């Protein structure tokens, strides 16, 4: 996987190209637009502790998941209930029945529909979904059913978009289906590396759907990413490593497949990282 540093190089190259284009009032001016204000910060979290830390840090919206080590799955009813009770910011619930690809069986689709109904009953403000066909296109029929079941909640299409066959056609399909935003890294390993594609998607969307960059977004690259792409929302985990307070640690027994990390440490959103992102976006 390319390093995040290469993403910063992509953004620097785009900004340099923009400056050259600006001398002749060329297309480069798109990349030098002032920072849109305000920029909404969405924190992707998979635990109550991460959700609380994100809210304290100033996140304006939560994507609530479980199991981010597998890219995220649907959170428990208990996690959603406690988040609803303790947070006063919108909560969008990930609807994903398992890790792996985004080609689902009829039984898995039934689970997704039921999870949407329960998220609505629990008071979620939005859901995050993604379904593909075997040929890599958006599964329009199933996405339409998910969107209809979710209404009147907000609907985001998640990073299944990043592994679809044709991003431009997929974006038009999602607009036609009434999806309100797309979470994407620009079909690259990280959003900074996919900044050029994200910028093109923003131009294609032309206000018809929100483009939400996510993947590898940090306090150090978020301002440049926003300037290079023209997005009005950003998505990040802001995670650091939490180490267990257990003093007794059994040896030779693993409960889950968590290699290479020990079961006595895990990722948790850090309040300070969210604060830095929020402050950076306010101050530019």
Feature annotation, model-predicted:
Residues 14-15, 23-24, 34:
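Short terminal hydrophobic/aromatic SLiMs and anchors at protein ends
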Residues 36-46, 95-113, 132, 156-167:
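Active-site mouth loops of central-metabolism enzymes
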Residues 39-43, 62-64, 91-95, 127-129, ...:
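Hydrophobic faces of well-ordered beta-strands that scaffold small-molecule active sites
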Residues 49-53, 104-115, 165-177, 217-232, ...:
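Catalytic cores of alpha/beta
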Residues 57-62, 87-90, 123-126, 149-153, ...:
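Glycine-enriched alpha-helix->loop->beta-strand junction motifs that scaffold or abut catalytic
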Residues 63-72, 118, 122-134, 179-192, ...:
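Glycine-rich phosphate-binding active-site loops on the catalytic face of alpha/beta enzymes
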Residues 72-99, 140-159, 195-218, 262-283:
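Alpha-helix-loop-beta-strand connector modules within alpha/beta enzyme cores
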Residues 78, 83-143:
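Glycine/small-residue-rich loop that forms an oxyanion/phosphate-binding "nest" at active or ligand-binding sites
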């Amino acid at each position: 996987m390319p390093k995040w540093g290469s993403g910063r190089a992509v953004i620097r190259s785009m900004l340099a190209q923009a400056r050259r284009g600006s001398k002749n009032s060329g297309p480069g001016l798109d990349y030098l637009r002032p920072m849109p204000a305000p920029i909404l910060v969405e924190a992707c979290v998979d635990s109550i502790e991460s959700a609380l830390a994100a809210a304290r840090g100033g996140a304006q919206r939560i994507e609530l998941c479980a199991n981010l080590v597998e890219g995220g799955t649907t959170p428990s009813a208990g996690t959603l209930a406690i988040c609803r009770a303790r947070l006063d910011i919108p909560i969008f619930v990930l609807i994903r029945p398992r890790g792996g690809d985004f080609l689902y069986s009829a039984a898995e689709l039934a689970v997704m529909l039921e999870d949407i109904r329960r998220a609505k009953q629990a008071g979620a403000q939005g859901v995050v979904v993604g379904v593909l066909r075997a040929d890599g296109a958006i599964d329009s029929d199933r996405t339409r059913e998910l969107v209809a079941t979710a209404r009147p909640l907000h609907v985001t299409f998640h990073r299944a978009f990043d592994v679809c066959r044709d991003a431009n056609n997929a974006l038009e399909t999602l607009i036609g289906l009434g999806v309100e935003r797309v979470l994407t890294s620009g079909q690259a390993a990280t959003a900074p590396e996919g900044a050029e594609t994200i910028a093109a998607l923003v131009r294609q969307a032309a206000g018809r759907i929100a483009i939400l960059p996510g993947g590898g977004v940090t306090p150090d690259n978020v301002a440049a990413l926003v300037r290079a792409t023209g997005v009005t929302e950003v998505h990040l985990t802001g995670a650091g490593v939490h180490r267990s307070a257990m003093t007794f640690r059994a040896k030779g027994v693993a409960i889950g497949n968590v290699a290479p990390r020990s079961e006595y440490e895990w990722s948790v959103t850090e309040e300070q990282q969210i604060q830095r992102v929020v402050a950076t976006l306010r101050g530019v």
